[in-house]
């Protein structure tokens, strides 16, 4: 246990998910998910409805139990701990505010349960804790050895027992649940120590301390003029601030946010996005944020985990995911895209749209003559004059032009019946003939995705 903790601190990982599997009855919701989150990061779990992103959040928060795998918090497996024993807080989609309490009452609620260190701890209690830790450690080690023996014994029995028999099922069930048995004893000493300290080393907050803490957090989130208001009198944005204040006031290591901005209108949502990022950076907290909104994820996150059907397709910075998606699914899910079937050629070239183009890729990534997917983002395409000296111009005809405020989104038909989309500040008339061009680093090549339905074409 000590080694795991040391490794986690060294890596600065506050959360580590290791081979997490989650099943609801016979349905596999999470399939061997591995994820590490560093202390102070803003990490977004991004995916469509039903992808498993909220399930991951609920597992970290303790609202669901993993079927298999480990959930490590500062190096200790906590998957069997209840939510109140984890040093984190959660903001739900519906805010879960108490309607019978005013703003101040909602915010201070958690402080009534909070404990802070006593100024003076009796020496006899310190000595008693040292003796207790020794006893608890010996007990945990003894129980872990017993688990090791049982696991080896049951695994050997399964080799000879007939599948489907009562004894086989019983042994298999024990082995399937063994992660939780090990997890309990791995964190046993820490949990007993925390219980002891809460009783003898800590005290409740005084009324003066509570009032001071509430005033501080109220000012931080901009609610100083709304302390005495009823929850029913607040706008959606103000309710969001109350939920945030209530979560932050207990000083958690991690804040979990389950699509907290989805119910807000566009303008308030944009303001709250900026506000959340400012708060996170100011307090240097770890935020784990769930959303299906790609723009929101790109704007807020230090790293994004893109989730598809219970698996993490890509985990990286917003720039890396947008510019260098791992496959066609990620490319289409994140932002607008033009994706074409292509063939990788020698000398870092690609055959695309019946022409050869230079790329930044090499033969360490793809085999010569390998079929690949080629991505070109609409904003990376230039519309040029026929006479302009640009290598490998593509000729096309504009079939649609949509004004989107700061740019026009143009659909161009190519001679081989392909279509390509372009973002440009200049408008062009429908049926106008144009020439398209792009730079060498605008073409991003990806391995073919075995799970993608290429016949469907659309996302």
Swiss-Prot record:
It catalyses: ATP + H2O + polyamine-[polyamine-binding protein]Side 1 = ADP + phosphate + polyamineSide 2 + [polyamine-binding protein]Side 1. It comes from the Bacteria. Keywords: ATP-binding, Cell membrane, Membrane, Nucleotide-binding, Translocase, Transport. One of its GO terms (cellular component) is ATP-binding cassette (ABC) transporter complex. GO terms for molecular function: ABC-type polyamine transporter activity; ATP binding; ATP hydrolysis activity. ATP binds at residues 47-54. Its EC number is 7.6.2.11. Residues 115-203 are annotated as: Insert. It is a peripheral membrane protein. It is found in: Cell membrane. Coiled coil: none annotated. Residues 15-334 form the ABC transporter domain. InterPro entries: AAA+_ATPase, ABC_SmlMolc_Importer, ABC_transporter-like_ATP-bd, ABC_transporter-like_CS, Mo/tungstate-bd_C_term_dom, P-loop_NTPase, Transp-assoc_OB_typ2. Belongs to the ABC transporter superfamily. Spermidine/putrescine importer (TC 3.A.1.11.1) family. Part of the ABC transporter complex PotABCD involved in spermidine/putrescine import. Responsible for energy coupling to the transport system. The complex is composed of two ATP-binding proteins (PotA), two transmembrane proteins (PotB and PotC) and a solute-binding protein (PotD). This is Spermidine/putrescine import ATP-binding protein PotA. It comes from Mycoplasmopsis synoviae (strain 53) (Mycoplasma synoviae). The lineage of its organism: Bacteria, Bacillati, Mycoplasmatota, Mycoplasmoidales, Metamycoplasmataceae.
